[in-house]
């Protein structure tokens, strides 16, 4: 199976389909290896232990590379930053830090989990609160998202958002 790709923001070739790794728990590594054997080359995960076992995705990636099945360049790895309200008690960052520091800490943890030196796509997964957002909240988010991008641009090829209206991101 040849991975189909389409152009994406900032000339990053993004796959049309990714293998999602949520809710696989102790089967994550085996299922990711099966997906690689079946031809998948793009994987979506998150540094959100509540739903993902990012370390097992990394173990599968390392095993597939070590066996010669794929190279790092063959793979497209996408992971996410999830705000505290979407996490359980196993936070990959210090919740008392500012957003930029939280994202840096989460990226560092993801890089370690995945065993790679860069992430192809990094998603800021939703607004910081689940409800009751006003215009001031959106303005703060827009300002912080640029700070976050500047802080992580050397480790991340593409930064995206999820669950945020395009009118907020595009102005």
Per-region residue spans from a language model:
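Active-site beta-loop-alpha junctions enriched in small/polar residues
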Residues: 22-24, 48, 80-84, 124-127, ...
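Hydrophobic positions in alpha-helices of CheY-like receiver
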Residues: 61, 81, 141-144
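Short catalytic/ligand-binding loop motif for oxyanion handling, primarily in non-cytosolic enzymes
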Residues: 27, 52-53, 85-87, 129-132, ...
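Glycine/proline-rich, positively charged
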Residues: 91-171
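Short amphipathic alpha-helical "recognition" segments used for binding
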Residues: 38, 82-84, 146
């Amino acid at each position: 199976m040849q991975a189909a790709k389409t152009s994406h923001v900032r000339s990053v070739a993004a796959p049309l389909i990714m293998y999602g790794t949520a809710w696989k728990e102790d089967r994550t590594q085996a299922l990711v290896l099966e997906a690689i054997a079946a031809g998948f080359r793009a994987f979506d995960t998150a540094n959100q232990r509540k739903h993902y076992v990012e370390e097992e995705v990394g173990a599968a990636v390392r095993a597939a590379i070590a066996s010669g099945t794929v190279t790092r360049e063959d793979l497209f790895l996408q992971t996410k930053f999830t705000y505290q309200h979407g996490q359980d008690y196993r936070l990959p960052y210090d919740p008392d830090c500012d957003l930029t520091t939280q994202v840096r800490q989460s990226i560092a943890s993801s890089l370690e989990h995945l065993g790679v030196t860069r992430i192809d796509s990094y998603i800021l997964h939703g607004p910081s609160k689940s409800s009751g957002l006003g215009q001031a909240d959106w303005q703060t988010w827009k300002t912080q998202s640029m700070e976050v991008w500047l802080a992580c641009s050397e480790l991340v090829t593409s930064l995206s958002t999820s669950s945020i209206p395009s009118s907020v991101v595009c102005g």
